Amino acid sequence: MYSISFAPLQGYTEDVYRRIHQDVFGGVDTYYTPFVRLEHGEVRSKDMRDVRPEFNQGVNVIPQVIANGGNELQQLVDKLTGLNYKRIDINMGCPFPLQTRHGRGAGLLPDVEAVKEIVGVMKENLGVEFSVKMRLGLEDENEWKEIIPLLNNVPLNHITVHPRIATQQYKGEVKMSAFDELLEACQHEVIFNGDITSVDDIKRIEDTYGDKLQGIMIGRGMLGRPSLAMEYKSGKQMADAEVVRRLKVMHDRMWQHYEQIIPGEAQRLAKIRTFWDYTEAILGRKAWKKVMKAGNLKNYLKAVQEL
């Protein structure tokens, strides 16, 4: 049976979501934080709050970082090791231009010299166990061919691969033939990521690759059906009505949390509504639209109650 990781998703899988998901659904072996990054030369305080140990107690959390080279990475490593983290994941896969145009995320993949710097930092920090999340390339699905040999020369826990190029973002087909080629070339454990939305999808990967893979990382598919990891681990499908019931439990606990920390009704509503972004399939279009289109807090909470 594969290990199941919950992918880091900016704006969704913050500390409160991770804690409550584990309590209400479970089945996830490892949760990754949305990437910690520098802003104006300093580590973002918002990102550091999300990884603080007191907000992640009882949850197996690995912080992810995003950097454009060795100097940025070392700053981030210093901050996280200061919080006693021994595992750090490095993002070489973020497809969004806000990061890639600054040489971060998948923007690293065509920049062999920057990756060499990152490898150097990993070698210098032997007390940290690193992993990497990457795509096949920024604009070319062959860019990984210069990167994997560099990563083969440094100890890594694993490499997570999303077999698309960054310019696809999440559209188009995953490039499985290129993934197969990468898998053969990689000397580390590999985790598969991309387009996993059902237990059948997990089993299809499992049947194809068996013990060639360490596990599966799921992102948007888990936001849409948070029972997915538990269903795979237990071998039992949860009834849709029970998934929705537990979604409402999750939602209500998150809402209570936001009431305490977010001033202003409009701000709280804008924040909590994103909880439902990927749930149209499980809720049904009519009910989902009612939640997403509610114009004020009273109508929103009524729409949620009626789910």
What residue ranges belong to the model's regions?
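Flavin-dependent oxidoreductase catalytic cores
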Residues: 1-307
